[in-house]
Amino acid sequence: MALLKVKFDQKKRVKLAQGLWLMNWLSVLAGIVLFSLGLFLKIELRKRSDVMDNSESHFVPNSLIGVGVLSCVFNSLAGKICYDALDPAKYAKWKPWLKLYLAVCVFFNVILFLVALCCFLLRGSLESTLAYGLKNGMKYYRDTDTPGRCFMKKTIDMLQIEFKCCGNNGFRDWFEIQWISNRYLDFSSKEVKDRIKSNVDGRYLVDGVPFSCCNPSSPRPCIQYQLTNNSAHYSYDHQTEELNLWLRGCRAALLNYYSSLMNSMGVVTLLIWLFEVSITAGLRFLHTALESVSNPEDPECESEGWLLENSVSETWKAFLESFKKLGKSNQVEAEAADAGQAPEAG
């Protein structure tokens, strides 16, 4: 028994074709929106590519760009099909290809749904990408004289100012790396020598942070050096006092920013997916309604349209059987090929 069987007369078929034509062209605009969202996200990721490990971070924007282009192509073609469906002579040339086209549309809808899910689920991958990239970026902060890295200080400083953050996980991350270049250290100073000798790696480590970690909203002038030395500052206790630094790490700040972007894009993609599914269902009804016209010479006669020719369970069984037959035919062909090669070898 057919699923969701609906009766159509000529007037209903025309209205369905016209409605689908309009929906397809609206979906072309939706495809442009998807393409634009993917392009925007790609640009935003490129802006911070210096503090990212780019091995996986561009999967989502590339996917959005791809499905946006495919949406424009498929829906433009579907709009043409719906327009030609009003003319039996023009519709005849599309008739042999409609089943294949509908199968492609179903596959595209599955891909679109998976892309929408990726927008929500790739937070973990993005977090590891940011953690690795920021850690390396902070290591190169001091290399202002090294070709290829001289821009890193400005990049990190602008990042911390823009996103109101400090370090990777927090301001204490700066205590673990040498972020002051040797060029600006006085190696004749006893303090510098003692600090370098105080650790195995021979690095100049200080309990201080770059100026870009300072919070301008703080009423107190920024304390960025000797943060853990209470006696170095008047009326100061680093354990109880609210420091005049950004306390949030840049990984969390960037992760929240990109996650909110991708969540919004995921919602938009899901809405477009629902729209695409309704178009595919409408095309199926139009296709079956035109196929079941009993008298093609009488355009006014009634016909029936349906979503599935059989029930869901029967359709699934038929699909599995056809899949098994396809596998068996491939196996038979392979055995025949092996049998043909055996006499040649003999």
From Swiss-Prot:
Residues 341-346 are annotated as: Interaction with MREG. Glycans are attached at N229. The keyword Electron transport does not apply. One of its GO terms (cellular component) is photoreceptor outer segment. GO terms for biological process: cell adhesion; detection of light stimulus involved in visual perception; photoreceptor cell outer segment organization; protein heterooligomerization; protein homooligomerization; protein localization to plasma membrane; protein maturation; response to low light intensity stimulus. Keywords: Cell adhesion, Cell projection, Disulfide bond, Glycoprotein, Membrane, Sensory transduction, Transmembrane, Transmembrane helix, Vision. It is found in: Membrane; Cell projection, Cilium, Photoreceptor outer segment; Photoreceptor inner segment. Gene3D superfamilies: Tetraspanin. Pfam families: Tetraspanin. It comes from the Eukaryota. Residues 1-24, 81-99, 291-346 are cytoplasmic. It is a multi-pass membrane protein. One of its GO terms (molecular function) is protein homodimerization activity. Retina (photoreceptor). In rim region of ROS (rod outer segment) disks. Essential for retina photoreceptor outer segment disk morphogenesis, may also play a role with ROM1 in the maintenance of outer segment disk structure. Required for the maintenance of retinal outer nuclear layer thickness. Required for the correct development and organization of the photoreceptor inner segment. Homodimer; disulfide-linked. Forms a homotetramer. Forms a heterotetramer with ROM1. Homotetramer and heterotetramer core complexes go on to form higher order complexes by formation of intermolecular disulfide bonds. Interacts with MREG. Interacts with STX3. Interacts with SNAP25. This is Peripherin-2. It comes from Rattus norvegicus. The lineage of its organism: Eukaryota, Metazoa, Chordata, Craniata, Vertebrata. The gene is Prph2.
